[in-house]
Amino acid sequence: MGFTDKQEALVRDSWEFMKQDIPQLSLRFFSLILEIAPVAKNMFSFLKDSDELPENNPKLRAHAVKVFKMTCESAIQLREKGEVVVGETTLKYLGSIHLQKRVADPHFEVVKEALLRTVKEATGNKWKDEMKEAWSEAYDQLASAIKAEMHAEAAA
């Protein structure tokens, strides 16, 4: 079916609202990833040997903002382009790093759950099943693009 006009509007409107608080929402997003899957901590060089709270770790904060913004902004592009558009070099890098870290399907599901919970918390009473479906579709498209690049690199 693809990404509909209505889904795009839901993602775009909620993203415009969330952009006001990117640093805090990004930290919440990453905290949820670590809460859902504590072993994920070992996948990040800046977290491996650290017991610091996420909000006190500047490398985590910077990474969280980058990941959260890219995820949300690629969702916005989905309707415009009909596919997730991430720069070719960025996509190659994402595929490469995810392959190196041995990221598997369950890891993508953890990130998806954390993203959906973050958006739900941020949007409050605006959160509905339709919004959940829109963000799910957008995230699934981004994850598929990263996985395709991972497979391409593994086959090379």
UniProtKB/Swiss-Prot annotation:
Cofactor note as given: Binds 1 heme group per subunit.
Q: Which residues bind heme b?
A: 45, 59, 63, 98
Superkingdom in the source lineage: Eukaryota
GO MF terms listed in the record are: heme binding; metal ion binding; oxidoreductase activity; oxygen binding
Q: What class of enzyme is it?
A: oxidoreductase
**Principal subcellular localisation of the protein:** cytoplasm
* Assigned GO CC terms: cytoplasm; nucleus
Q: What reaction gets catalysed by this protein? A: Fe(III)-heme b-[protein] + nitric oxide + H2O = Fe(II)-heme b-[protein] + nitrite + 2 H(+)
Site keyed Homodimerization: positions: 132
According to the UniProt entry, where does the motif Homodimerization sit in this chain? Answer: 35-39, 105-117
Q: Where in the cell is it found?
A: Cytoplasm; Nucleus
* Keywords of this entry: Cytoplasm, Heme, Iron, Metal-binding, Nucleus, Oxidoreductase
The cofactors required by this protein are: heme b
Enzyme Commission number, as recorded = 1.7.2.-
- What are the Globin domain coordinates in residue numbering? 2-151
Family as reported in the entry's similarity comment:
Belongs to the plant globin family.
Function according to Swiss-Prot or TrEMBL: Phytoglobin that reduces nitrite to nitric oxide (NO) under anoxic conditions (e.g. during flooding or in waterlogged soil). May not function as an oxygen storage or transport protein. Has an unusually high affinity for O(2) through an hexacoordinate heme iron because of a very low dissociation constant.
Complex formation? Homodimer.
The name this protein carries in UniProt is: Anaerobic nitrite reductase HB2
The beginning of the lineage is: Eukaryota, Viridiplantae, Streptophyta, Embryophyta, Tracheophyta
